[in-house]
């Protein structure tokens, strides 16, 4: 069974930006945990949760844990919400260019999913407002796993502390066509189709 998506999620770090509405962590966790518990109560044993918003993940992990504590035989997969691209792309995106939100990659995703909603004539420029500590790490010559962990640690938890227009990244969003979104999404879909088939073949 494929359920309707939840239209609201956990986006506290974007609170204060025009038009941004977020559920509290407690409410979001409660909603997801209740959905899972009711499904498991009705006899379902497995669930796959897809979330394209990475900000949902900490709360989703808690919701899944709550539901699985109540139903010890339940099985849940939290599907990575990001298209399957190379490790080098991820490093360039998240550390080298700080392209976490509303930048080059997410503009490419909007173009892929809802091209008619993308006003290519009004795409804002890259972000130049991020804190100096983040810029210093971005410009480091040889990036490694420690740098990735440090980037997560030093990143402020509110968009207003990073950007005036919501864009986090230092790369130009108008160059979105260079991102291979179609092939990445095809790989993403194939990965989870194969996962579900293998999962289905396993005995409960």
Residue ranges of model-derived segments:
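Extended, histidine- and acidic-residue-enriched regions that form the cofactor-binding/catalytic faces
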Residues: 1-46, 54-204
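Conserved SAM-binding loop
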Residues: 49
